[in-house]
Every structure is written in structure tokens, then in C-alpha cells.
């Protein structure tokens, strides 16, 4: 695991300029953005430090994962305010066996994924509806172009971990299943769009609706 983390750090540093080239955030006219209500004189190195990846990166991948579902730990400007105006962000993605990151898009950035541990099947669909897929091994990288619908799937019986870099401090996330079936679009509209019936649409919606809290 130590060698995997070393590889992760080296390639993350190398990939950072690539993410910046693809950046789409507005330029700023200062060195960095001071949060509202903060005094510049009180800012220290702590402001430019993010420690939220310590737990996922220290996980023993040979042991059962504490969460049976796909999880993501983000370092965007929401979690790491120093990224505001810097046109870069990261995420650690954890895939227990037989889990996936469902089809989704990032409207404001491409995604550069580095597989640190395990194996993944990934893919995206371009604007001509052509599907591009690849099976990744640890150490492989894959780029999902900006705005394209894409996914990652761990079909094996071992966990996988990846690091994703984005050319935006807030790349955004649009989940295709939730956006289509979880936003109260009329059942008749969806049934006609997918050439099916309303009961089928209602079943799909039910599967994406969180259970009511007691």
C-alpha cells in the first residue's frame, strides 16, 4: 500500500498542470481568494492545507471496507476554501466489490482519474453517442472529457481506490439516474421518452427515492 500511495502522490503532482490547462474557472486578480469575513493577516499555512484524505488513503485495502457502497471524499472549494480561484480540485473514490459510480457528468471540468489500487471498468459517451470503454489496472490513468456522461464499475471481488483531478475548484455533478427519475419530471413525459409505460417509470422512480425518515 505504501508504494501505491507514493505512486499516487507523484502522479497527482505531475497531473496538476494538466488539470490547470483544462481549467474553466474565472481568473482572479489576487494571489488567492480570502474568505468573506476573514482577515488576511490571520491566514497561515493551515488555510492552504487539506487533511481530509488521510483516512481513505491510510485504509488497508486487503481488509473489508467499512462501507459497502461506493463513496467519494471531495476536496473542492466547499471543503477546501483555499481552492477558490485556483481552478483545481481532487476527489478520492472508494469502490467496494461489485459497486459503481453511476453515469454522471461534470459540467465545468474534465476528470483525470488515476487508479491507485484494484481494477475498474470505465467509460464515457461522446456527443455522437459513441461509447468509449477501458479496463484499468492499478497505475493506469483515464480522462473523461468535460461534460461527457461517464461511469466507473468495480465488477471484481476486491476493492478499488482512485484519485480524480479536476480543472475546476467546483466541477459540479449531474447524476443521470437521479436527474432523470428523481426530479419530478412528469411520468408521461418519461414514459414517452423511454418508449415504455407509466408503471415502469414509477418503479424506476421508487428505486431512486430515499426512504422516508421515521
From Swiss-Prot:
Pfam families in the cross-refs: Cupin_1
Residue ranges annotated for the Cupin type-1 domain, each copy included: 59-202
Signal sequence extent: 1-23
Glycosylation sites: 42, 60, 69
GO CC annotation, single: apoplast
Binding site for Mn(2+): 104, 106, 111, 150
SMART domains: Cupin_1
Family, similarity comment: Belongs to the germin family.
Protein's recorded name: Germin-like protein 9-3
Source organism: Oryza sativa subsp. japonica (Rice)
Amino acid at each position: 500500500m505504501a508504494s501505491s500511495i507514493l505512486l499516487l502522490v507523484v502522479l497527482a503532482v505531475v497531473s496538476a498542470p494538466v488539470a490547470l490547462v483544462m481549467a474553466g474557472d474565472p481568473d482572479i486578480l489576487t494571489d488567492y481568494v480570502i474568505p468573506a469575513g476573514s482577515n488576511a493577516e490571520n491566514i497561515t499555512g493551515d488555510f492552504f492545507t487539506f487533511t481530509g484524505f488521510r483516512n481513505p488513503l491510510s485504509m488497508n485495502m486487503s481488509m473489508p471496507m467499512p462501507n459497502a457502497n461506493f463513496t467519494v471524499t471531495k476536496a473542492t472549494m466547499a471543503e477546501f476554501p483555499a481552492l477558490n480561484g485556483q481552478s483545481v480540485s481532487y476527489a478520492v473514490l472508494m469502490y467496494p466489490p461489485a459497486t459503481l459510480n453511476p453515469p454522471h457528468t461534470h459540467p465545468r471540468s474534465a476528470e483525470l482519474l488515476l487508479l491507485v489500487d484494484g481494477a475498474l471498468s470505465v467509460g464515457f459517451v461522446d456527443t455522437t453517442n459513441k461509447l468509449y470503454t477501458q479496463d484499468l489496472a492499478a497505475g493506469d490513468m483515464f480522462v473523461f472529457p468535460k461534460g461527457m456522461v461517464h461511469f466507473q464499475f468495480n465488477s471484481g471481488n476486491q476493492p478499488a481506490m482512485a484519485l480524480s483531478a479536476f480543472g475546476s475548484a467546483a466541477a459540479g455533478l449531474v447524476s443521470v439516474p437521479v436527474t432523470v427519475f428523481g426530479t419530478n419530471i412528469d411520468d408521461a413525459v418519461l414514459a414517452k421518452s423511454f418508449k415504455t409505460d407509466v408503471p415502469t417509470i414509477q418503479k424506476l422512480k421508487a428505486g431512486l427515492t430515499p426512504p422516508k425518515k421515521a
